């Protein structure tokens, strides 16, 4: 049986990246909460900053 987690950086960024979070009110709320908590990485996009993926 195939495992359920088949990692893909492209899908990961498209679903959980910064621009996707900013696209909806709830996503912006997620970012605000993570900022308030003092998270170093707000989104998965922060792992790549500037690199090609």
From Swiss-Prot:
Keyword ATP-binding: no
Disulfide bonds: none
Database matches in InterPro entries: Ribosomal_bL34, Ribosomal_bL34_CS
Compositional bias segments (type: Basic residues): 1-16, 31-42
Gene Ontology molecular functions: structural constituent of ribosome
GO cellular component: ribonucleoprotein complex; ribosome
PROSITE patterns xref list: RIBOSOMAL_L34 (PS00784)
Region (Disordered): 1-53
Name of the protein in question: Large ribosomal subunit protein bL34
């Amino acid at each position: 049986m195939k495992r359920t987690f088949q990692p893909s950086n492209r899908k990961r960024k498209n679903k959980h990246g910064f621009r996707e979070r900013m696209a909806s009110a709830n996503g912006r709320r997620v970012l605000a909460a993570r900022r308030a908590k003092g998270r170093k990485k707000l989104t998965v996009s922060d792992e790549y900053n500037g690199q090609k993926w």
